[in-house]
Amino acid sequence: MAAKFIILLALFALSQASVVRRDAPLANFLQDLEKRAADIQKTFSEQFQAISNSKNVQDVNKAVKESSDVVLKQLSTLSSSLQSALTDANGKAKEALEQTRQNLEKTAEELRRAHPDVEKQANQLRDKLQAAVQSTLQETQKLAKEVAANMEQTNEKLAPKIKEAFEDFVKQAEAVQKKVHDAATKQ
């Protein structure tokens, strides 16, 4: 019962974290992005801890494997978006984008290596999946801070690309959370 309450609370927090002001200026957008990434990271972590005690081990393992496929695909998309944003960036923003892209590729590679033997390594894969999402959110936060700190050097085309890539990743992370949660609470 307590686990279900925690999951409901986490889902509520996630839904509140998903609210974005569309008319916010660039600086506010970057601050909101940082805050949202931190909220999603916390919620994601709480949900993964709550489902680790699930009695539906097979369903959870299957959901984790399928979710890791989705996260890998989204990490590749996010990395590609950052690569295209590099063409519009300059100075420190370009360095931050390149660093973020490299770190995301490293995270994706670690998740790929943990992926094949899901049944044998379900807990390890679950940990890698959680780490991949958290790492991506942390990289996004670092990127937002760097871009905000170098606002005068940042091209106006760059912020919408970062925002779009982040929004796409958040949608996938939320779908992963829901899928794993549904598998864990299946009766």
UniProtKB/Swiss-Prot annotation:
Sorted UniProt keywords: Cleavage on pair of basic residues, Lipid transport, Secreted, Signal, Transport
Tissue: Hemolymph.
Gene Ontology cellular component terms for the protein in this record: extracellular region
Propeptide section residues: 18-22
Keyword Cell division in annotation: no
Secretion signal, residue range per the UniProt entry: 1-17
InterPro entries documented for this protein: ApoLp-III (IPR010009)
BP GO terms, sorted: lipid transport
Example of a GO MF term: lipid binding
Main location class: secreted
SUPFAM superfamilies the UniProt entry points to: Apolipophorin-III (SSF47857)
Cellular localization per UniProt: Secreted
Family statement drawn from the similarity comment of this UniProt entry: Belongs to the insect apolipophorin-3 family.
Assembly with partners or alone: Equilibrium between a soluble monomer and a bound lipoprotein form. Apolipophorin-3 associates with lipophorin during lipid loading until each particle contains 9 or 14 molecules of apolipophorin-3.
Role, per record: Assists in the loading of diacylglycerol, generated from triacylglycerol stores in the fat body through the action of adipokinetic hormone, into lipophorin, the hemolymph lipoprotein. It increases the lipid carrying capacity of lipophorin by covering the expanding hydrophobic surface resulting from diacylglycerol uptake. It thus plays a critical role in the transport of lipids during flight in several species of insects.
Record-given protein name: Apolipophorin-3
